[in-house]
Amino acid sequence: MTILSAITSITRPNKISKSVVSSNGGASLSLSSNSVACATACGGSSYSYSSSYSSSGLGYSYNSSYSSSVGYSSSVGVVIGSCGHCS
């Protein structure tokens, strides 16, 4: 499973920042956000927050995954599938 990740600024534990998706033009955009807590503890206090975005009319969909290992360092990436931070 390929994970493209980018390190973001350090955040406090249990703080999730919301993402806003806006549409330019007349294309219809449907936004659905799912908060998924992975029950698989990959080591210590690791957890992940997953949001799913789909766009009708534009023909694409992607999953954004938020994972934190100890609650202080965070990474945001685009993954195919769900709960792929353990791989």
Swiss-Prot record:
Quote the InterPro entries the UniProt record gives. HssA/B-like_chaperone (IPR050533), HssA/B-related (IPR008455)
Protein origin, superkingdom = Eukaryota
GO BP annotation list: sorocarp development
Residue ranges that the Swiss-Prot or TrEMBL entry lists as coiled coil: none
Identify its protein family: Belongs to the hssA/B family.
PANTHER family from the xrefs?
HSSA/B-LIKE PROTEIN 1-RELATED-RELATED, HSSA_B-LIKE PROTEIN 1-RELATED
Name this protein carries in UniProt: HssA/B-like protein 28
Primary gene name: hssl28
